[in-house]
Amino acid sequence: MKRLLILIARAWQLGPSRVLPPSCRYSPSCSQYAIEALEKHGAIKGGWLAAKRLLRCHPWGGHGYDPVP
């Protein structure tokens, strides 16, 4: 499961993310954050952290450096 989720995030980085203008308000990008969270915490907790990050990434959300805990 973890590998599949990482593969999806990598596919996003290599596909649509390269064509679309940068829109992530955080550093590292949301897809990189998801990969790091999944590698560090596994599919369940890492997936939860990635989902929470994606929900925070909007025009009225925060911004700046936000590392994986």
UniProtKB/Swiss-Prot annotation:
Domain of life according to the entry: Bacteria
GO cellular component, one term: plasma membrane
Keywords, sorted A to Z: Cell inner membrane, Cell membrane, Membrane
Keyword Cell inner membrane: yes
Residue ranges the record marks as coiled coil: none
UniProt name for this protein: Putative membrane protein insertion efficiency factor
Taxonomy of the source species: Bacteria, Pseudomonadati, Pseudomonadota, Alphaproteobacteria, Sphingomonadales
Family assignment from sequence similarity: Belongs to the UPF0161 family.
Main location class: membrane
Species this chain originates from: Novosphingobium aromaticivorans (strain ATCC 700278 / DSM 12444 / CCUG 56034 / CIP 105152 / NBRC 16084 / F199)
Compartment(s) where it occurs, according to its Swiss-Prot or TrEMBL record: Cell inner membrane
Membrane topology: Peripheral membrane protein
Cysteine pairings via disulfide bonds: none
Role played: Could be involved in insertion of integral membrane proteins into the membrane.
